[in-house]
Amino acid sequence: MSSLETRKIEPQSSTTVTLGAAGDTVAVPTGGIVKTNTVKDAGGNTLFTSDGAGTLSGVNSAFNGSTIFISSQTISSSTASVEFTSGIDTTYDEYVFYYVNIRGATNNTHFGFNGSIDSGSNYNVQKSSTYFNATHQENGSSGEIQYNTTGNVDQGTGNQPVTTGQGNDADECCSGCLQLFTPGSTLWYKRFMAKSSGNWHVDGEENSRMQGQFATQSAIDAIRWSFASGNIESGTIYLYGIT
């Protein structure tokens, strides 16, 4: 078998290098690596594109159910809020935020979000929601499942809680996810729902479920996260698109 050793192959003309002919198999041996940022099929259709750092874009719609990383923000010093003002548009019908190990500065307060229709100039979109949770104290003294009106928003423009009564001890935090549907639509109201797990302020656990809607036909193009009282001390928030 003949072998060709080279560091670079370039086409004599145009921008296409053809390896083999119809019916041939081009094999990459075990341990071999093919590096590229854009993968296309024989018809020139892009299957996906990478930015060289592992973030994909332009993913072909045939890859149904893919989770596409958009951006993330890590809170390493105390801040009043975290805003996502880009990446929320009509590209995907569903967006998911993951909030991980979010710790607040204030005891017995609520972590939540609000939406914007003007790229983050204002966060005051009218919304309504339902909220229920299960709580249990660490010492086993009490526990309950309840419809929690503290987490409700009744056609209001303030924050929508995803946790209520969160503690702020050094080892207390919350984690969860928020699903946001068709935020770029100018026809529908924008549905959302969240599920969260966190430390309750009386040394207990809270498991919560929330669902609701942004009562606007305008596109939601930014989301802000904050506590009802006090700063965010630490944690990471991720944004993904779902194909």
How does the language model describe each region?
Residues 2-3, 10-12, 20, 33, ...:
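Surface-exposed molecular-recognition determinants
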Residues 25-26, 104:
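Short, surface-exposed beta-strand-loop junctions and turns on beta-sheet-rich folds
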Residues 29:
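Acidic, glycine/polar-enriched metal-coordinating patches/loops
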